[in-house]
Amino acid sequence: MLNPIVRKFQYGQHTVTLETGIMARQATAAVMVSMDDTAVFVTVVGQKKAKPGQDFFPLTVNYQERTYAAGRIPGSFFRREGRPSEGETLIARLIDRPIRPLFPEGFVNEVQVIATVVSVNPQVNPDIVAMIGASAALSLSGIPFNGPIGAARVGYINDQYVLNPTQDELKESKLDLVVAGTEAAVLMVESEAELLSEDQMLGAVVFGHEQQQVVIQNINELVKEAGKPRWDWQPEPVNEALNARVAALAEARLSDAYRITDKQERYAQVDVIKSETIATLLAEDETLDENELGEILHAIEKNVVRSRVLAGEPRIDGREKDMIRGLDVRTGVLPRTHGSALFTRGETQALVTATLGTARDAQVLDELMGERTDTFLFHYNFPPYSVGETGMVGSPKRREIGHGRLAKRGVLAVMPDMDKFPYTVRVVSEITESNGSSSMASVCGASLALMDAGVPIKAAVAGIAMGLVKEGDNYVVLSDILGDEDHLGDMDFKVAGSRDGISALQMDIKIEGITKEIMQVALNQAKGARLHILGVMEQAINAPRGDISEFAPRIHTIKINPDKIKDVIGKGGSVIRALTEETGTTIEIEDDGTVKIAATDGEKAKHAIRRIEEITAEIEVGRVYTGKVTRIVDFGAFVAIGGGKEGLVHISQIADKRVEKVTDYLQMGQEVPVKVLEVDRQGRIRLSIKEATEQSQPAAAPEAPAAEQGE
């Protein structure tokens, strides 16, 4: 008999159910977590033995959404799920980041977490459910894991924090923040915000951490009922004698090497010291493990840098704790792009471009929660040459997708609304040099490139990466961290925003004991750094350019009667196709009658507008128009009177005397004055040449609304 063990509890406005013991019993642990009809099945498998020579912790997190969860069949050619989407990759990273630091140092057994979304309520995002599931499964598994963790989404609506807001509530929220942590400490924050203050952001982190304690308590209760015995794993005993010997050979030399401010020169010197030290030790005892020696040397490096920072000495590159590296800001660096910028901060550099397109260029995302259209695209590329290495170049890796998403979050809050600026915008950041915080350099470069492209962003934004070194009660917060300070520190803390507030905040904390006060110091120090960078950026460009690039499509907007949309589109799209070919423009029509005409040439746009106005103009009964004969039949002739509208001149209305043969009076293509006698309920038009000739002057084309240019 299958006997499920179930825990059910209230979490904010939702009911959460944890269930184990009924499915995937050959996995190390498996949990089905549901939150109001959104259900995620999470499994964990851990290998009891580490692979020989394994020198890093091989943790893999896979997050996969099944379309059956939403009652749909995949739209792909093969009608089955393919490789992970960008959204799935981002959620896999979201699960990975808070659990990774909770495995003990020295644990290198392979662990795989697989989270599968099996049911989805469109109002409840599965990411928090998956994070809770991963925490529960790891806690049940017996694998050495210092959890459990809780996870919460925090919104900010009407000046109130909201726990786990629904998708509808998120649309009204000024904040979308995910926080994860243990009972004692926050471990990870990922957020985007509409320029909130430092205090509001910190309040959200603290609120989310307090609220998620109920999750941790319930996972602990589930473990008491259904947990597997804890693995009898012990770290390798520390070889104190070997540590001392390595330190005697290398510590002083590494300390000197870390006074070299140039990254490449420093790395070269550190490599020499390491290889010479390892060679000396292997000559003394060839049974020594080279990997173990490498780990000891890395620990010495870490200690050298950390102790120097804590003692108040200058950092690796000679800076004080709150100093920003030298900045170089240039805009308009590429002649044919719509907007471009080169942003350099020390040895980190980003070449960023902005490209404007029409609504047709927007990305349609067929997601589990429903289809949505994205009109702001942000792509981040990290080629191997940026760190002086060779390597594969191809589709973006998980890290590039994650960094691109963070940079996008940093800029999103200042992007103009589509009704004010009806363009799809794509920003691409090419990292040309990297030594710390290339994602935040991408935010700065994006802000500059967008202004260079004439995109009316609400404010300039900049980003900065902060670090932390902490031993006991002694701690130092570092501004604008280098790559080495990121690896060797206890916290990586990225903040983007304008002068008025924060647009994105990302935190990854590797230790417990980071208090609210420490986070407050880091946020305030980050604000000072952000304002300094914005000041330098404003010297290069302090407002969006007054006009878009001559190479960008100009979008002109006119309004037509929604009833006339069918006339502009035509049967099977024939009219709109002919219009785009005739005028050389791109034409998009919305359901409310908004027509957007995109063209790089103003004259072409005017021509397209004129043609659309002709097609949509109302035909006035009693008015005389100049028309062209398009068809001749026995009972009369059809005459086009502009805008693709055609009316019938009956044989009795051709002349004021009896007409025996229509062709005696009219020829194909002949221009004739016609008077509109009637437009019937079906839109058919009756015309008269006889009555028109009695009136002296034909009327001009009907008036239509003037175009507005969407700049």
Curated annotation (Swiss-Prot):
It holds the Pfam family KH_1. Residues 622-690 form the S1 motif domain. CDD domains: KH-I_PNPase (cd02393), RNase_PH_PNPase_1 (cd11363), RNase_PH_PNPase_2 (cd11364), S1_PNPase (cd04472). Its EC number is 2.7.7.8. Residues 553-612 form the KH domain. GO terms for biological process: mRNA catabolic process; RNA processing. Mg(2+) binds at residues 486, 492. It is found in: Cytoplasm. The keyword Magnesium applies. It comes from the Bacteria. Residues 694-711 have a biased composition (Low complexity). Residues 689-711 are annotated as: Disordered. Its cofactor is Mg(2+). GO terms for cellular component: cytosol. It catalyses: RNA(n+1) + phosphate = RNA(n) + a ribonucleoside 5'-diphosphate. Its main location: cytoplasm. GO terms for molecular function: 3'-5'-RNA exonuclease activity; magnesium ion binding; polyribonucleotide nucleotidyltransferase activity; RNA binding. Keywords: Cytoplasm, Magnesium, Metal-binding, Nucleotidyltransferase, RNA-binding, Transferase. Belongs to the polyribonucleotide nucleotidyltransferase family. NCBIfam families: polynuc_phos, PRK11824.1. Involved in mRNA degradation. Catalyzes the phosphorolysis of single-stranded polyribonucleotides processively in the 3'- to 5'-direction. Component of the RNA degradosome, which is a multiprotein complex involved in RNA processing and mRNA degradation. This is Polyribonucleotide nucleotidyltransferase. It comes from Escherichia coli (strain ATCC 8739 / DSM 1576 / NBRC 3972 / NCIMB 8545 / WDCM 00012 / Crooks).
